[in-house]
Structures are given as structure tokens and as C-alpha cells.
Amino acid sequence: MKCTLRWTITALVLLGICHLARPAYHKKCGRYSYCWIPYDIERDRYDNGDKKCCFCRYAWSPWQCNEEERYEWLRCGMRFYSLCCYTDDDNGNGNGNGNGNGLNYLKSLYGGYGNGNGEFWEEYIDERYDN
């Protein structure tokens, strides 16, 4: 009995680690592919026209999403999710040399500028552009 319990606990711990460590993944829903970022963890996000990045916030009203995000109901199979999704204009008008204007997302959160290639790297924003 003790041995079984020990194996059960080990399995649950490993399962938990794998669950928490999973990367953002893409899910096709309707017209868009959604890139899901689990547990509201800050990581790089991108939007290449048909991908929108969402936090699994389970918001129940539009006001729970941040200013630069859009509240969406998303149906996948039999389940409904309520998500906060980044809007299409997050990257702004990147000019290729790291000085995209970033529009609402980068400006409001970091007071900095996008890197112009469609990705957000918080480290660069904090160290290089936030001046």
C-alpha cells in the first residue's frame, strides 16, 4: 500500500511539472489560429496576421482584460473559453531596425518600442528601449 501511494505521488508530481512547463501552443478555432499562453505567464508573443495570442485568464467580462487585449469567447469542440486576446495592432509599424512604434501594447506597458519584427522581447524592452 505504501509503495503504491509513493508511486501515485511521484506520478502526480511529474504530471504537475509537465503541465506547468508546457509551452504556448496553437489551436485552430474558426478563422484564426490561437496561440495559447498558459497560466498568465509572461513570455514572448507574436501575431503574424492569423495568429492571436491569448492568456487563459478565464475572464468573465471584457473589463478583466487589459487595455491592449480584446475579450473573446472561443468555442473549441464542446467547450467554451473566455479569453483575453492581444489585438491585431500589437506590433505597430516596425521599420526593421527595432523601432516599431508598438502602439498600445508596448507603449502602455513598458513605455518602450517594438523590435520591428513581430516579436516582443521584454528583456530588450526593459534594458534598451525604456528610456
Swiss-Prot record:
Tissue: Component of conchiolin, the organic matrix of nacre. Expressed at extremely high levels in the dorsal region of the mantle, which region may be responsible for the nacreous layer formation, but only in trace amounts at the mantle edge, which region may be responsible for the prismatic layer formation.
Leader peptide range in chain numbering: 1-23
Cellular component per GO, a single term: extracellular region
Intervals holding Sequence repeats: 91-92, 93-94, 95-96, 97-98, 99-100, 101-102
Function: May be specifically involved in the formation of the nacreous layer.
Family: Belongs to the N16 matrix protein family.
This protein's name: N16.3 matrix protein
Native source species: Pinctada fucata
